[in-house]
Amino acid sequence: MATETTTHNHKLSNKEVEETLRSVIQILIDGQEGFEKISEHLTDESLRRYFAAESLNRAQFRGDIEEVLHQEGVHDVKESGTVAGGIHRTWGDIKAHLGGGDHSLLETAEAGEDAAKKAYQEALKKELPLPIKQLLTSQYAHVQESHDYVKAARDARK
């Protein structure tokens, strides 16, 4: 395993790449758990299905990134959500919003999606190896679409 990855004359160490990917994995775990928990409490059936599917998408995104880390020789890739406060930091206190109906739950989900967008934006600012950058770019496009869907659903329920 090489100790450095060179891109555009800027060297990003494998450790920096690993840390960048771990931060995205952490936010994906939060999203996976957040979408799942909220899906259990939404009253709108189409939203329930969307949120359940989105939880699975985040699990798949996480698996794709973990596979990249394994290919780079990192074998301990199990993460448990964001270090800075877990799901409550990025998805709010879901339990506090359960009594607020779908609109309140959708606000919570949108805040979580804002955090996910920010994590991807931060990662994509870095000079990552091209295959990793392509993977994150593709995932980020999906996260943006999901954010917009959640926001539109929230706005429709004002």
Residue spans of the language-model regions?
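Conserved alpha-helical segments that form or flank metal/cofactor-binding pockets of metalloenzymes
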Residues: 47-83, 150-153
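Alpha-helical bundle segments that constitute or directly flank the non-heme di-iron/ferroxidase center
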Residues: 9-43, 103-127
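Alpha-helical scaffold segments that form or flank carboxylate-/histidine-based iron centers
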Residues: 16-24, 45-63, 102-106, 131-143
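N-terminal/domain-start segments enriched in small and hydrophobic, helix-friendly residues
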Residues: 2-26, 80, 87, 152-156
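Charged/polar positions within long, soluble alpha-helices
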Residues: 33-40, 63-70, 74, 92, ...
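Generic structural concept
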Residues: 18, 25, 29, 52-55, ...
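Carboxylate-rich helix-loop segments that flank metal/cofactor sites and access channels
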Residues: 4, 64-117
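Preference for long, well-ordered alpha-helical segments
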Residues: 105, 109-158
